[in-house]
């Protein structure tokens, strides 16, 4: 695969930022959503190196969704994500990307007894107690029973209490 720049023309005020999408299986609607918010999106293959990514001069990195066990990508994804932390730029992810971010921080993932699949999944924001109705399709979750002091849980599933979001407070 090669690096692609996604330029879908939507009429919305955008944040002037170049976000690199690491493609672990990203869906087109995710790219549309990102491009509606940021001025430039570059999609790179999941096997891209740290040097490949920084050569694009990112303002942020998005770790995409994708299939399967997050620990199976440890040989190529985790080392790159750990190096990206040194850039001190926003790194965010959904689904598999969220799980890879957690693994890169030393957290663990586990296979869920019953995965989350489909629409209408209520997720609680622990910062303000608001609830969003989401669509999900994953069978793994992040274990949060032993979070380091620099990581906090931000979102949980109201179906089973499993983790749906984390935030790194300090990388130093």
Over which residues does each language-model region extend?
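RNA-binding accessory domains that recognize and position tRNA/RNA substrates
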Residues: 1-56, 68
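Residue-level preference for short coil/turn positions at secondary-structure junctions
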Residues: 3, 14-15, 57, 87, ...
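Active-site-proximal beta-strand elements of phosphoester/diester hydrolases
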Residues: 18-23, 134-135, 172
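A generic "binding-loop/recognition-motif" signal
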Residues: 26-27, 49, 97, 138, ...
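Conserved beta-strand termini and adjacent loop/short-helix elements that scaffold enzyme active sites
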Residues: 44-46, 112, 137, 156
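Cysteine-nucleophile active-site neighborhood
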Residues: 60, 65-144
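Catalytic beta-strand/loop cores that center a nucleophilic Ser/Cys/Thr
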Residues: 129-171
């Amino acid at each position: 695969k090669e690096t692609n720049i996604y330029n879908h023309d939507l009429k919305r005020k955008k944040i002037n930022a170049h976000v690199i999408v690491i493609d672990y299986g990203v869906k087109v609607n995710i790219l549309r959503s990102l491009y509606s918010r940021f001025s430039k999106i570059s999609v790179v293959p999941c096997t891209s190196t740290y040097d490949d990514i920084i050569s694009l001069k990112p303002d942020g990195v998005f770790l995409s969704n994708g299939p399967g066990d997050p620990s199976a990508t440890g040989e190529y994804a985790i080392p790159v994500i750990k190096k990206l932390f040194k850039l001190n730029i926003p790194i965010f992810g959904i689904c598999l990307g969220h799980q890879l971010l957690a693994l890169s921080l030393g957290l663990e993932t586990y296979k869920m007894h019953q995965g989350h699949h489909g629409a209408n999944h209520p997720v609680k924001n622990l910062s303000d107690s608001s609830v969003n109705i989401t669509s999900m399709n994953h069978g793994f979750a992040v274990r949060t029973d032993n979070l380091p002091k620099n990581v906090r849980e931000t979102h949980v599933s109201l179906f089973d209490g499993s983790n749906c979001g984390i935030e790194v407070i300090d990388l130093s």
